[in-house]
Amino acid sequence: MLTKNLLLCFAAAKAVLAVPHDSVVERSDALHKLSERSTPSSTGENNGYYYSFWTDGGGDVTYTNGNAGSYSVEWSNVGNFVGGKGWNPGSAKDITYSGTFTPSGNGYLSVYGWTTDPLIEYYIVESYGDYNPGSGGTYKGTVTSDGSVYDIYTATRTNAPSIQGTATFTQYWSVRQNKRVGGTVTTSNHFNAWAKLGMNLGTHNYQILATEGYQSSGSSSITIQ
């Protein structure tokens, strides 16, 4: 029995040693190249606009700042990311934008921002992929703005990433019924409608015209004015 066990161990060791060194190096190089293709999370100023890009590190996503208020994103089999250009701090401004947004799966194109005191994450969704992001929240009502009805929702995130680290906070959503990519978003209409429903914002932090992807693939190229 001892001899048989020794032979089995020897055979297993031989099989491991038989793996070509080159194949291990090739796999390592491939993983390194994949990580190089993904843009790391960052924030800052670019050509007169504030930008923010966040990713959980899953999949392949490339965010690129362009001229003035333009940016582009390409993503494949991502976990979750959100990025775009805008202002810091944000405000109740009219935001005019144009471009393309082509998600395959779950993705949103929205005016996206944060406030503090209270800590609120908000979305004014202009277009989305195969999942209505408001459907997981609590329906509150509607607001009509910029040629469409928007459905209003709230949701609570527990121990989730935020501008203040991991926290529990409320989300406000306005989701456009007639999807579009391009036009003017009158943010004050949404903020006022939310306030009438008891959904109060705090002190504005950043505000961007954002592309977000969740467990999906796609591309987006957006310009704000």
UniProtKB/Swiss-Prot annotation:
Its main location: secreted. The active site is at E121, E212. Pathway: Glycan degradation; xylan degradation. GO terms for cellular component: extracellular region. Keywords: Carbohydrate metabolism, Glycosidase, Hydrolase, Polysaccharide degradation, Secreted, Signal, Xylan degradation. One of its GO terms (biological process) is xylan catabolic process. The keyword Hydrolase applies. It catalyses: Endohydrolysis of (1->4)-beta-D-xylosidic linkages in xylans. Residues 37-225 form the GH11 domain. GO terms for molecular function: endo-1,4-beta-xylanase activity. It is found in: Secreted. Belongs to the glycosyl hydrolase 11 (cellulase G) family. PANTHER family: ENDO-1,4-BETA-XYLANASE A-RELATED. Endo-1,4-beta-xylanase involved in the hydrolysis of xylan, a major structural heterogeneous polysaccharide found in plant biomass representing the second most abundant polysaccharide in the biosphere, after cellulose. This is Endo-1,4-beta-xylanase B. It comes from Aspergillus kawachii (strain NBRC 4308).
